[in-house]
């Protein structure tokens, strides 16, 4: 792109496998140049539990129960807490250069998309959560 212009791309994963989606997310992070490129990855998963980089799965999840129910357990490379995913959960990853990262801007993109696409009114609170109903 010309000097100062930012290319924007959206990747929508066709996979619902947590390991494939985390691998794709990690590959993009490690191999793409975000100096003049903003990327959004959209993905969903079959039922799974995802733990943060430094978390102990035995403290964060009922591992025997996950095995009984055939629910995948995965570790992501980023920090953060343990979360449950299923096909009703939409995951969005924003990739941008560190100097251009703006959480509020990313949240506003999601807020606008909810309204434009579905007529859903939402707000962003002081904790930077998107609330549909508070």
Where are these regions (language model features)?
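Catalytic beta-strand/loop module used to bind and position nucleotide/cofactor moieties
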Residues: 87-134
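N-terminal lobe of the biotin/lipoate ligase/transferase fold
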Residues: 1-102
């Amino acid at each position: 792109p010309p000097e100062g212009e930012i290319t924007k791309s959206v990747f929508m994963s066709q996979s619902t496998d947590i390991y494939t989606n985390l691998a794709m997310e990690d590959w993009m992070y490690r191999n793409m140049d975000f100096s003049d490129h903003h990327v959004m990855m959209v993905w969903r998963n079959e039922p799974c539990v995802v733990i943060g980089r430094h978390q102990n799965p035995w403290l964060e999840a009922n591992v025997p129960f996950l095995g009984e129910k055939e629910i995948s357990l995965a570790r992501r490379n980023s920090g953060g807490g343990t979360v449950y995913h299923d096909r009703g959960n939409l995951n969005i990853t924003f990739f941008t250069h560190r100097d251009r990262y703006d959480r509020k801007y990313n949240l506003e993109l999601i807020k606008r998309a909810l309204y434009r696409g579905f007529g859903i009114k939402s707000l962003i609170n002081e904790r930077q959560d998107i609330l549909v109903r508070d």
